[in-house]
From Swiss-Prot:
Metabolic or biological pathway: Amino-acid biosynthesis; L-arginine biosynthesis; L-arginine from L-ornithine and carbamoyl phosphate: step 1/3
Name of this chain's protein: Ornithine carbamoyltransferase
Catalytic activity from the UniProt record: carbamoyl phosphate + L-ornithine = L-citrulline + phosphate + H(+)
Top-level class of the enzyme under EC nomenclature: transferase
One Gene Ontology cellular component: cytoplasm
Residues the entry annotates as binding carbamoyl phosphate: 52-55, 79, 103, 130-133, 261-262, 289
E.C. no: 2.1.3.3
Length: 302
């Protein structure tokens, strides 16, 4: 039976631990120049409905380093962009490539693609979740803090797709997450209810200081996701009290780290001072997309 990676909950706690351990091994092997072509003759088809820097580069480089090949597919250059049904695209691609990664506008598109594909489908981002990002985030937290169990994470800002995956990941990691968002932009009640029902430690507040107090990790993300450009002035006004700055970081534990999945709008959701500080794990976090996704690809295809 094929395996997909559409939600962070598509893997178990044990599978997550093994995947992160493998990612760290792959990272060390890359550092010393060891590359094993375990995915030789494998091809990853990558559909990008949204533009990308980190997702595209990390998956392309990852497949190359594992001995495989990645194809960049823009829907505008495919029949999918001219109205071909997703289910037909899924069936055809299943005959040509080994797996599909899609960066989609709508989560339903990812689900439909997976339902009709005979090969693994990876959610490279949707409007509901960004599970590949959370793999890298968990890896980064383990590297910096040497554990996830009991780690307190403060999410500051928009309760978006990355926030959703973070909340759901607490079921697998034992982390505690406190989300500080304006009420209008809080995470979906269905997400929070599901996480709580499964034993997660999640709390939603509106005060960023309350969330950051005693935090081991302070995380944020852009206030303006792709497709929201027309709301830029309104969103900036609403979210400015949620800026991650030195004053907010002073509420966190001594030695706390700050994370941002990028791209960052400097001096909006996070100040230059914090992003470029010793507390910043942002660049390791970005690099770890490569290693975590390589481990995921091996798990799905090797």
């Amino acid at each position: 039976m094929k395996k997909d990676f559409i939600s962070i909950l598509d893997i178990s706690r044990e599978e997550l631990a093994n995947l992160i351990a493998h990612a760290r091994k792959l990272k060390e092997e890359r550092r010393v120049g060891i590359q094993t072509p375990v995915l030789a003759h494998k091809t990853l088809g990558m559909i990008f409905e949204k533009s990308s820097t980190r997702t595209r580069i990390s998956f392309e480089a990852g497949m190359f380093e594992l001995g495989g090949h990645a194809l960049f597919l823009n829907p505008k250059d495919m029949q999918l962009g001219r109205g071909e049904a997703i289910r037909d695209t899924a069936r055809v691609m299943s005959r040509f490539v080994s797996a599909i990664m899609i960066r989609a506008n709508r989560h339903d598109e990812v689900l439909e693609l997976a339902a009709h594909a005979d090969i693994p489908v990876i959610n490279g981002l949707s409007d509901r979740e960004h599970p590949c990002q959370i793999l890298a985030d968990i890896m980064t937290i383990e590297e910096r803090l040497f554990r996830t169990e009991g780690v307190k994470v403060a999410w500051i800002g928009d309760g978006n797709n990355v926030c959703t995956s973070l909340i759901l990941s607490t079921i697998l990691t034992g982390m505690e997450v406190i989300v500080a968002s304006p009420s209008e932009f809080a995470p979906g009640e269905d997400v929070v209810s599901e996480a709580l029902r499964m034993g997660a430690k999640v709390r939603i507040v509106t005060d960023p200081r309350e969330a950051a107090t005693g935090a081991d990790v302070v995380m944020t993300d852009t206030w303006i996701s792709m497709g929201q450009e027309e709301e830029i002035d309104r969103r900036r006004q609403i979210f400015m009290p949620y800026q991650v700055n030195a004053e907010l970081m002073a509420c966190a534990k001594p030695g706390a780290i700050v994370m941002h999945c990028l791209p960052a709008h400097r001096n909006w959701e996070i100040t230059d001072e914090v992003l470029d500080s010793k507390a910043s794990a942002v660049w390791d976090q970005a690099e770890n997309r490569l290693h975590a996704q390589k481990a995921l690809l091996v798990r799905l295809l090797a």
